[in-house]
Amino acid sequence: ITQPCRSHGSPVARDWPLAPWFMEAPVYGNFRRYYGMRRARAVGHEGGVAVRADGVDERVLALVAWCKAHATRIRRIERVLDVGCNAAKPLLELCQLLDPPPTQAVGVDIDAHLVAQARSALRRAWSQRQPAADSTSIEAMHYFPTCFTSLMGQLPLPSSSASFPTNVTFVAQDWMDGTVAAQYDLILCLSLTKWIHLHHGDEGLVRFFGRIVQSLSLIHISEPTRPLYI
């Protein structure tokens, strides 16, 4: 039995049955249901009271607020890259909250299962997106109620559009091994640097930031605290 190697995509021989995907060790930080676990921890730290009833990632809110406060000092964020996007919750929220919204967003993760989850999350976000409160257009009046995604499934993505959701794409690959072919105005690296450090050491971190420098105008890094290394 073979399965692709996470780092390079080449098949690796195994002489035992493959375990279900949800039982595989997340050795690259590729946790399933990571944002659900992270949300539970955040609620616990607040004494059991959620900070945001809508569940929007607090890092996204901080980033959106920072961009708004410095709008006259930074260039417009048109292209966004999320390295180690997991199931893409922050990226999808950012695409919907930035004003003006980005024209292109790319999520990259080493885990193909998580990329599949991210694509499903994109369809779900599109299906559950509600019109603006002050909108009176015919399209707004016929929006898809949130409960319908459970009753009838998700809406198909539009066949052609220059805006959300068709401006969001996901790629399953090790970004450290790919070629730098595009320039981005914002790169997200959320809860990622620890795993690069663990697998590649100090030299790997330096190489990672070197690739970032080649690709970006602005970077948002989530710095891990010391207990996360233990």
Where are the regions a protein language model picked out?
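Conserved alpha-helix/loop element of class I SAM-dependent methyltransferases that forms part
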Residues: 29-44, 51-76, 93
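A short glycine-rich, Lys/Arg-flanked "PGG" loop and its adjoining helix->strand segment in the class I
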Residues: 206-218
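Conserved SAM-binding loop of SAM-dependent methyltransferases across substrates and taxa
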Residues: 87-100
